[in-house]
UniProtKB/Swiss-Prot annotation:
One GO cellular component, as annotated: cytosol
GO molecular function, one term: thymidylate synthase activity
A biological process term (GO) from this entry: dTTP biosynthetic process
Self-association state and partner proteins as the record states: Homodimer.
Pfam families xref list: Thymidylat_synt
Subcellular localization(s) per the UniProt record: Cytoplasm
Lineage: Bacteria, Pseudomonadati, Bacteroidota, Flavobacteriia, Flavobacteriales
Active-site feature positions: 156 (nucleophile)
Binding annotation for (6R)-5,10-methylene-5,6,7,8-tetrahydrofolate: 51, 179, 273
Protein family membership: Belongs to the thymidylate synthase family. Bacterial-type ThyA subfamily.
Catalytic activity: dUMP + (6R)-5,10-methylene-5,6,7,8-tetrahydrofolate = 7,8-dihydrofolate + dTMP
NCBIfam families, A to Z: PRK01827.1-3, PRK01827.1-5, thym_sym
Protein name: Thymidylate synthase
Length: 274
């Protein structure tokens, strides 16, 4: 997938060395944008194999508004394990903010879809996971922050906006912090899929997914992995098929998604910076 590989090359060639919260160190740039026309195929990185099951279940978990990793673990998804407390709690993370903003019963997803159906020309179709009132105390552990009703980890993909033109729905995501090797391929696929889901339930066609970054970085312990990806020839994009019978965003189940024609190079392991 050219857009992703271009991002990797740009950061390697233009990034500056920076320290970070985890102590790992990064090569980083500030401000970058990728665009994906969803009519050209589903944007799944092919220079390494991605775990689609984790991507789908995480998105469904967000839409449920849940803050406990039990659902993820029941479905074999471990991507949030490192940040949860002993009871599996993460604090009021993404899904909670999407569905019950600041515990004020503001369902941003429901309001978004209602606006898309009633006033698709609105410039107010935004959803935010960034809530300053629940950001963690950096001097405390993940579990201590959760116990204090804070998030274990601040949202990396902070907010997104939808736009309708000529019957096509596009989504722009602002990601304040982006782990290019491990996180970004997941984020691309997740928000592309989310855009397709929203488009279907609003009787629209999927348009573009635009991915805008703040701090986009490659961790120092991922340089070998991204070099390996750059040495591999990208394969054609697959096609994502959604169950056309689903008309409510909250009715989607794992079985309603089918990825056709996904061919990729082998998986590449990389340590998560916690």
């Amino acid at each position: 997938m050219k857009q992703y590989l271009d991002l990797v090359k740009y950061v390697l060639n233009n990034g500056t060395q920076k320290g970070d919260r985890t102590g790992t160190g990064t090569k980083s740039v500030f401000g970058y944008q990728m665009r994906f026309n969803l009519a050209e195929g589903f944007p799944m990185v092919t220079t390494k194999k991605l775990h689609l099951k984790s991507i789908i279940h995480e998105l469904l978990w967000f839409l449920k508004g849940e803050t406990n990793i039990a659902y993820l673990q029941q479905n074999g998804v471990k991507i949030w394990d490192d940040w949860a407390d002993e009871n599996g709690e993460l604090g009021p993370v993404y899904g909670h903010q999407w569905r019950n903003w600041n515990n004020e019963e503001i369902d941003q997803i429901t309001e978004l879809i209602e606006t898309l159906k009633i006033n698709p020309n609105s410039r107010r179709m935004l959803v935010s996971a960034w809530n300053p009132s629940v950001l963690p105390d950096t001097t405390k552990s993940f579990a201590e922050n959760v116990a204090n009703a804070k998030v274990a980890l601040p949202p990396c993909h902070a907010f997104f906006q939808f736009y309708v033109s000529e019957g096509k729905l596009s989504c722009q995501l602002y990601q304040r912090s982006a782990d290019i090797f491990l996180g970004v391929p997941f984020n691309i696929a997740s928000y592309a899929l989310f855009t397709m889901m929203i488009a279907q339930v609003c009787d629209l066609q999927a348009g573009e997914f635009i991915h805008t970054f703040g701090d986009a970085h490659i961790y120092n312990n991922h340089f070998e992995q991204v070099a390996l990806q750059l040495s591999r020839e990208p394969k054609p994009l697959p096609k994502m098929i959604l169950n056309p019978a689903v008309k409510n965003i909250f009715d989607f189940k794992f079985e309603d998604f089918k990825l056709e024609g996904y061919e990729s190079h082998a998986h590449i392991k990389g340590a998560v910076a916690v």
